[in-house]
């Protein structure tokens, strides 16, 4: 373990990268608060940021606009910094239905959610890392601006253990219970502990592969050992270990009882208001619901919807912002906003949507006014908490350009020598027939095609029409969940189909080097789907291929089209000039086709079998060349596969377990051969 970032990469900065890295680092070290990295598709923005992180040596938070992009970034940074703490912090809900009230139909919708334990573990690991290591890089979504437990409580509750320390076993068990760990003598699961004589086994909530064994002798800690909870194998012995709370929302008994008193005071004031307004039904409803919650908190320390009382539990004043992931960041940290033209507006929108729903709940007596303070940060609060920042985008928005005050670092020249796609304009009248002929040409070359339409209906009709004419085509739309969307993009790259039709394909920002043609239908219809930024982003989808071309079907030239074409031409001119000057021959990007979500420690967002729509999923891994593996690699692979097999069997997924068993047998046979 090291406290310094160590970048591991088979290549060195090239093209515009060296100058961009030097400028970003110099600005950061000079104390510049905001700057923008304008990088075209395929220019190595992530690699550039990784070099900046290594040079400035500061804890880093990278914000992405969605889970899919966050998973991709997590995987990339993990490969760049294999010896450092790269973490993943996104919403842990597989499914979330917030509580709401619809006055027009007098309908109350109860909160309903499904928590993904794997992502919860990764969130806990992220906060622990930020508090304990300087070489920490956390990839997060907009989930970072939502309320968490206060870091002061989180730190004050932690259990610090050292060899030779005197501690009573009962006191130790009580402390673990305060951390919300549960005692389970039959099965050691994450967030649980068991007692065997003077030996305590604890499975830390933020870990997925290591458990802690505490061996006591006559009230003294004799030995601290990390072991594999599946096999019992000893991994290493320790001198000191810190156990962090099982949840970010853990709090002391005293704080909970104090909160009960302040909630009672608020309830009394609110009931007086409702009675004075003659809102008797609302008053009766609020009294009943709140009294039940108070009894639960007094007896067991928590209740359903306890987050609505977070202001009382954290001791904040009315209207004060809640503690968030930003409170866990050290003041000298670096903040990177990826795809900032999407992420920044997202941050601004979160507070307003949450507020309108909760105001209705408060008005009609379902919640106390303090529930309004369980909220995401307002935009100005987020700005105040943000450390020194780098906005990263191919099309920075007006906010980023204004905040950067002219400090724009460009990444236009690609290390591969690839130039931006040729842009052609063709008439709308024959767009479908023209598109079909272009698609056939690309299929002959073994390339893929992206088509963007304006409406769902048009996308569906076009998909059906192309399919009827023998073209292998799929349709990407908003009803498809994150994991399935990633699988569709992977299948496109693998050649399982040739054409992908969608409405807003640019939102992924994913790498698809096999795509050589992007067709934008009805490009002259001004709107957010055909704005300058959207057009540049969509054209950029073909920028990773040597034969890249974008066709805009339009009958008139709009301002957005002209601006997008001018910017693309400007970039092409600079790229061609650089290639001629340095004798570079452009070549297509050869990016391995792997599972993007593997970046988030395997199917992190996948639903458990039996929850939601059942669908087949890949169980066994892709066949590997086992002959090239050494004995240590084979042993590690076997152990990982066995863990997967046992987990599937435990979840009653016997077919999946059998597939992995067969893979284990093949690997064992290959190792013997």
UniProtKB/Swiss-Prot annotation:
Q: Which UniProt keywords apply?
A: ATP-binding, Cytoplasm, DNA damage, DNA excision, DNA repair, Excision nuclease, Nucleotide-binding, SOS response
* Signal peptide (from-to): none
| Gene3D superfamilies per UniProt | 6.10.140.240, P-loop containing nucleotide triphosphate hydrolases (3.40.50.300), UVR domain (4.10.860.10)
Q: Which residues hold ATP?
A: 39-46
Subcellular location field: Cytoplasm
Chain residue ranges for the region called Disordered: 601-626
Superkingdom to which the source organism belongs: Bacteria
**For the Helicase C-terminal domain, which residue ranges apply?**
431-597
Q: What region holds the UVR domain?
A: 635-670
Q: Which CDD domains match?
A: DEXHc_UvrB, SF2_C_UvrB
Q: Which GO terms describe its biological process?
A: nucleotide-excision repair, DNA damage recognition; SOS response
Domain named Helicase ATP-binding is located at 26-414
Kindly give the Pfam families that the UniProt entry links to this protein.
Helicase_C (PF00271), ResIII (PF04851), UVR (PF02151), UvrB (PF12344), UvrB_inter (PF17757)
Query: What's a Gene Ontology MF term here?
Result: ATP binding
Could you give the domain comment from the record?
A: The beta-hairpin motif is involved in DNA binding.
Give the protein's biological function: The UvrABC repair system catalyzes the recognition and processing of DNA lesions. A damage recognition complex composed of 2 UvrA and 2 UvrB subunits scans DNA for abnormalities. Upon binding of the UvrA(2)B(2) complex to a putative damaged site, the DNA wraps around one UvrB monomer. DNA wrap is dependent on ATP binding by UvrB and probably causes local melting of the DNA helix, facilitating insertion of UvrB beta-hairpin between the DNA strands. Then UvrB probes one DNA strand for the presence of a lesion.
Subunit notes for this chain? Forms a heterotetramer with UvrA during the search for lesions. Interacts with UvrC in an incision complex.
Family assignment from sequence similarity: Belongs to the UvrB family.
- Recorded protein name is UvrABC system protein B
Q: Which gene encodes it?
A: uvrB
């Amino acid at each position: 373990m090291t406290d310094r970032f160590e970048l591991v990469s088979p290549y060195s900065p090239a093209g515009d990268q060296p100058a961009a890295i030097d400028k970003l680092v110099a600005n950061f070290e000079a104390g510049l608060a905001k700057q923008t990295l304008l990088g075209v598709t395929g220019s190595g923005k992530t690699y550039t940021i990784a070099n900046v992180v290594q040079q400035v040596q500061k804890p880093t938070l990278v914000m992405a606009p969605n889970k899919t992009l966050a998973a991709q970034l997590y995987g990339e940074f993990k490969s760049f910094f294999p010896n450092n703490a790269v973490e993943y912090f996104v919403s842990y809900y597989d499914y979330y239905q917030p509580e709401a009230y619809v006055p027009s139909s007098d309908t109350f919708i109860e909160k309903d959610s499904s928590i993904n334990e794997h992502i919860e573990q990764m969130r806990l690991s992220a906060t622990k890392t930020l508090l304990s290591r300087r070489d920490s890089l956390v990839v997060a979504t907009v989930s970072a601006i939502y309320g968490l437990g206060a870091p002061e409580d989180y730190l004050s509750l932690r259990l610090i253990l050292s060899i030779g320390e005197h501690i009573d076993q009962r006191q130790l068990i009580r402390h673990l219970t305060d951390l919300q760990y549960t005692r389970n003598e039959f099965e050691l699961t994450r967030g649980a502990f068991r007692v065997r004589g003077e030996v305590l086994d604890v499975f830390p909530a933020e870990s997925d592969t290591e458990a802690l064994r505490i061996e006591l002798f006559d009230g003294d800690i004799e030995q601290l050992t990390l072991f594999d909870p599946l096999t019992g194998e000893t991994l290493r012995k320790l001198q000191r270990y810190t156990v962090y709370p099982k949840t970010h929302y853990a709090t002391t008994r005293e704080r909970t009882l104090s909160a009960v008193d302040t909630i009672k005071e608020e309830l009394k004031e609110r009931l007086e208001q409702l009675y004075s307004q003659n809102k008797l039904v609302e008053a009766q409803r609020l009294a009943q619901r709140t009294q039940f919650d108070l009894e639960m908190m007094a007896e067991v320390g928590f209740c359903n919807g306890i987050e609505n009382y977070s202001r009382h539990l954290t001791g904040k004043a009315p209207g004060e912002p809640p503690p968030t992931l930003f409170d866990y960041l050290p003041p000298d940290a670096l903040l990177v906003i990826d795809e900032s033209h999407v992420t920044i507006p997202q941050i601004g929108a979160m507070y307003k949507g949450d507020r309108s729903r909760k105001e209705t709940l408060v008005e009609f007596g379902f919640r106390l006014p303090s529930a309004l303070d369980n909220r995401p940060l307002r935009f100005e609060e987020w700005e105040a908490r943000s450390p020194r920042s780098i906005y990263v985008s191919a099309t920075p928005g007006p906010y980023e350009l204004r905040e950067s005050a002219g400090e724009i670092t460009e990444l236009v020249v690609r290390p591969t020598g690839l130039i931006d796609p040729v842009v052609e304009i063709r008439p709308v009248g024959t767009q479908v027939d023209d598109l079909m002929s272009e698609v056939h040409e690309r299929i002959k070359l073994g390339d893929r095609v992206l088509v963007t339409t304006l409406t769902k209906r048009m996308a569906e009709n076009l998909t059906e029409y192309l399919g009827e004419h023998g073209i292998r085509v799929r349709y990407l739309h908003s009803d498809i969940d994150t994991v399935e969307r990633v699988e569709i993009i992977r299948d496109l790259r693998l050649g399982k189909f040739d054409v992908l039709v969608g409405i807003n394909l640019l939102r992924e920002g994913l790498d698809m080097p096999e795509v050589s043609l992007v067709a934008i239908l009805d490009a002259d219809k001004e709107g957010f789907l055909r704005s300058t930024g959207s057009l540049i982003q969509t054209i950029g989808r073909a920028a990773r291929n040597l034969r890249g071309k974008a066709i805009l079907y339009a009958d008139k030239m709009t301002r957005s089209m002209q601006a997008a074409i001018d910017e693309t031409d400007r970039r092409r001119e600079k790229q061609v000039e650089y290639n001629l000057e340095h004798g570079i021959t452009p070549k297509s990007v050869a990016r391995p086709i792997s599972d993007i979500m593997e970046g988030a420690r395997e199917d992190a967002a996948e639903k458990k079998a039996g929850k939601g729509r059942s669908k087949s999923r890949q169980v066994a891994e892709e066949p590997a060349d086992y002959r090239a593996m050494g004995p240590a690699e084979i042993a590690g692979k076997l152990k990982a596969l066995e863990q997967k097999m046992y987990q599937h069997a435990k979840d009653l997924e016997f077919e999946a377990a059998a597939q992995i068993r067969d893979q284990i047998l093949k690997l064992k046979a290959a190792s013997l051969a």
